[in-house]
């Protein structure tokens, strides 16, 4: 519109700019109204896929004696992708809440489940070098990888379920957890077995029940905001 200045009356470029802005706003509103929760579903699906990839990459690093200096930067990059997707989902949840979408509560629960999974997947016992040594002493490499691969496979299934509006099927990983708990008992002096058994049991519970472990008031800041007119008066 600036290039039109001098070639036509002053009000015409301003009018074109205003109409373009109005069109952009109306198009975005219509697009969001048409698809409603689908953008959030896509973000949640990507979040679960990234959690699966992060879980596999983390336990590959800890159980296959790879060089932490080479493996850690890509792992941290995956972790950052997870954090970015969590922020994106949080923003989209606020948009759905403002529009009183009927799928909001279910998608909020899926997001809370993702937060719990992220916490238990990303937690670490020590630095990678120490954990690698402890894992080797406990002879738990194969069993830990088995648990991690089971979790990752389930997360990918859930990602597709979220994206394509499917209800999740039944899930359990009792055999995998049983093998891990057996190693934890056999090597009681080694913290790796007990640490892995506890966190994988929490992950398995979330994946089985599809319910968050912890109560979170994610929309607390939204609830504190005043409507426009009361806010202006105050």
Regions found by a protein language model. Give the residues of each.
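Cytosolic regulatory and coupling regions of membrane transport/channel systems
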Residues: 31-234
């Amino acid at each position: 519109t600036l290039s039109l200045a001098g070639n036509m009356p002053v009000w015409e470029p301003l009018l074109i700019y205003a109409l373009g802005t109005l069109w952009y706003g109306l198009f975005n509103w219509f697009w969001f109204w048409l698809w409603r929760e689908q953008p959030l579903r896509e973000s949640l699906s990507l979040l679960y896929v990234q959690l699966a990839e992060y879980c596999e990459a983390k336990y590959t690093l800890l159980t296959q004696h790879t060089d932490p200096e080479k493996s850690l930067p890509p792992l941290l990059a995956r972790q950052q992708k997870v954090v970015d997707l969590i922020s994106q989902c949080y923003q989209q949840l606020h948009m759905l809440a403002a529009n009183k979408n009927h799928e909001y509560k279910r998608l909020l629960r899926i997001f809370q489940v993702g937060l719990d999974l992220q916490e238990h997947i990303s937690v670490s016992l020590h630095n990678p070098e120490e954990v690698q040594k402890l894992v080797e002493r406990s002879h738990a490499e194969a069993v830990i990888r088995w648990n991690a691969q089971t979790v990752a496979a389930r997360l990918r299934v859930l990602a597709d379920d979220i994206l394509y509006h499917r209800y999740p099927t039944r899930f359990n990983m009792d055999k995998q957890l049983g093998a891990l708990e057996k190693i934890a008992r056999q090597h009681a002096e080694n913290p790796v077995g007990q640490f892995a058994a506890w966190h994988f049991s929490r992950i398995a519970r979330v994946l089985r029940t599809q319910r968050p472990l912890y109560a979170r008031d994610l929309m607390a800041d939204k609830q504190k905001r005043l409507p426009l007119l009361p806010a202006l008066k105050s």
